[in-house]
Design a protein with these regions (language model features):
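Domain-level signature for soluble enzymes in the chorismate/prephenate branch of the shikimate pathway
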Residues: 1-90
Length: 90
């Protein structure tokens, strides 16, 4: 019973980690593209667009908009950090 729930949570957590790793790889590729095309790392309009869409989708799924705001802001901040670090190394 409880063990089964915990195993299910562990499985979900592993999928989340895999998706975050994949997202960071794509973010680094975006950083390379931006550097090649002399673009700013932070594209505030894109972030706001993505965040608004995520919050709306979260609400429709019964997930707290505030929670999603914090999670996606943290993911975005890490993506920016990785883009900067990765392009500085090249």
């Amino acid at each position: 019973a409880l063990r089964d729930f915990r195993l299910h949570i562990d499985s979900i957590d592993n999928r989340i980690l895999e998706l975050l790793a994949e997202r960071m790889e794509v973010a680094r590729n975006i950083g390379d593209y931006k550097k090649l095309h002399s673009m700013a790392v932070v594209q505030r309009d894109r972030f706001n667009e993505m965040l608004t869409a995520a919050e709306a989708r979260a609400e429709s799924m019964g997930v707290s908009k505030r929670f999603i705001h914090r999670i996606f802001t943290a993911i975005h901040d890490e993506s920016v950090r990785q883009q900067i670090d990765d392009t500085e190394r090249k």
